[in-house]
Amino acid sequence: TGTEETLPENQNGDTQTPPEEATDAPEEETIPELDNPDISEAQYAGNVVIVGDRAMEIPTATDSVIESYAKTVNALASALGKDVRTISLVTPNGGEFYSPESMHQGLNSQKDMIDYCYSQMNGSILTVDAYSKLRAHTDEYIFFRTDHHWTQLGAYYAYTAFCEAAGFEAVPLDAFETGRYDRFVGSMYNFTANYPQSQTLLDNPDYLEYYLPIATTHAK
């Protein structure tokens, strides 16, 4: 037979219930589903892929190219010495998240490219996982549709990944004064200007957001 555990009684003879243990476990971040378009929706304007009103570059990189980059970072870290931290942040572009699924798999998987690149770097180099941070916010405005860059918001999320890796405290978004400029058309429109598909980009411009720090800083 098992031994029964008797709960203690208080002065009134009532059985005391042990208090619930407090948990400080952080809430898990919900990763949005990727709504990848069908390959039949893709149009080509030179080396640019246009799906709907979004233009994207689909990069490819051979192992030798990736190894060459990692070798350069390794050499830089060695030249700077042990007293200087070398930090590498390699990031995907919008094609990794918003292109048809077959365009970011296999040799076109930017996640695989980044992972391989980091694996070729010396152990002394601090590598930043900006990919996962961006992936968690793909339902937000983190990449332009008419430009090959990330938006200011996308850059902010990569900055928070950098801070987490480097041991810094990221400045929260609500600590900035924000504003917006409308009707921005970027580099992808310029790259496709000689193709009829570029009109779609011109008719559906992006917007620019800016973030000004509320706190005044001084540098010498």
Please describe what each predicted stretch is.
Residues 1-220:
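Extracellular glycan-modifying ectodomains
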